[in-house]
Amino acid sequence: MTIYQVLPRLYGNRHTTGIQGGTIRQNGCGKMLDFSLKALRALRGQGYTHIWYTGLLEHATQTVYPDIAPDNPDIVKGKAGSPYAVKDYYDIDPDLARRVADRRAEFCELLARSHKAGLKVIMDFVPNHVARHYVSDAAPQGVRPLGADDDTALHFSPDNNFYYCPDETLRIGSYTESPARASGNDVFHAHPTPDDWYETCKLNYGGMSPQSSTWQKMTDILLYWAEQGVDGFRCDMAEMVPVSFWHHAIAAVLSRHPHVRFIAEVYNPQLYRDYIRHGGFHYLYDKAGFYDTLRAVVAGGLSTQSIPSVWQSTDDIRPHMLYFLENHDEQRLASPFFASAPQAGRPAMAVAALMGTGPLMVYSGQEIGERGMTAEGYSGQDGRTSIFDYWAYPFCRKLAGREALTPEEEALREWYTSLLQLRRKLRGTPFYDLMYANPALTRQYAFLRGEGRETRLIVANFHGEEVRLTVRLPRHAVSFLHLPCAPGPYTIAVPAHDYAVLTLEPSPPFGHSPLRRSRRGVRDTVDTLIP
């Protein structure tokens, strides 16, 4: 599984200029119809198997639409609003439709185009919290609104959908709420700070029973979208929802739609196995270990010798761990806060793509070196692409084919395409870490993928200069992978901030193989020392 994450709000925006804190009229907005069949097929050709359309569900916004209940601007972050302050679980965000009244039809068309292009579709499921002004006008007949039957005089009741602060009033600007409800990030009082998720209300799963109101309503929402043809759900802040709920809900969906896949945003490594084995998740974010370590290697100079212990800590569940270097929450790889340049991030991306046996995710714009250094309004110059503002990004126009890529951007996208093609070839092959046999390597990471005559030696170079180095191949690797060559050191040249790949061939007489070309186009002499 190789996922391409993209915000439809940004991708197809036709505007060429932006005003800080601007409205949708001033700054424009992408639409679902902007994802043409040609563009989707191009993504499939680049090596992606799934596309995660981020922000499809209707959410709180400062934009006012006829026949849709408006939101108080004081409880909306940014003019566009956060896609994770969901206002109606059963509806599509009106910003994303060419014709607002036809937004459901346009979504169905997007789903059909994606499938026709060979891409499976992932959408957000935000189970922990909703927008404070949650109004579901698209729910199927007979569905009771969240909170409609709550006893608001109780702080907690297993039958309530929300948590309440009786006799307390929430005041945020001109917005008041009485009794106050708990905020999404577990603030159980009426005084959230600007750094809290004050624009959201936390949902109550405390009934701990499939018969509880919240469990039933949230499971029905998953079933609804699965029945529309959605192939997977990226479950926001899944660890803030009891694992027992996931055990129930995922089983309910898979009993009717066994092809659907569930991805969990979980940051606590102590919870990983429970959310996989009991909760039923297919995949989990590997941020607290893998992402954080690779980032420290790139940005902080941490030794590459630290990488093996990270993957070893999740070795028993490694096929379930989703690797990434960018997403909407994290700073861009090419930003000054991370690698500072697109090229400097390439070795980390090569490691993430080629050593793992689980899924990989790329964030739209990453493949052409987007830096995320625009101050859009609610978001500042923080190395992230804003999820709160309307904005006209040059990288989005380029990806949509409305502006030409620079030669550097084109070369980087070709690099990503080549990397993903190699990743596909290596799918399902054994992995063997060579770092224990090469303790002198601190800015390179060496490993094997494959078996027998199809085994490849892969070295990623985190150094800013080309290196020519010797990689020792231990006897255990030769026997374990049934290699056709003898153990011994191999000399390999690796370009600056890049990776090189060599296929291990049978050892010729006298211990020398002919000159050959590596995957990255560097001519390498491979010397095999036969004991």
Language-model regions, residue ranges each:
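N-terminal structural segment of carbohydrate-active enzymes
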Residues: M1-K120, N128, V135-A139, D150, ...
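C-terminal beta-sandwich/jelly-roll accessory domains of carbohydrate-active enzymes
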Residues: G464-P531
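Loop/helix patches that line or flank the sugar-binding groove of alpha-linked glycan CAZymes
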Residues: R14, G18, T61, K77, ...
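Hydrophobic faces of well-ordered beta-strands that scaffold small-molecule active sites
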Residues: T2-Y4, I51-Y53, V121-M123, F233, ...
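Active-site-proximal helices and loops of the catalytic beta/alpha 8
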Residues: G142-P145, A153, N160, D220-L223, ...
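Conserved, mostly hydrophobic/aromatic
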Residues: V6, Y53, Y89, S114, ...
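Aromatic- and acidic-residue-enriched segments that line the glycan-binding/catalytic groove
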Residues: H59-V86, P127-P192, R277-L284, A375-F388
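The substrate-binding groove and active-site-proximal loops of carbohydrate-active enzymes
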Residues: N13, T17-L33, A85-R104, E199-T214, ...
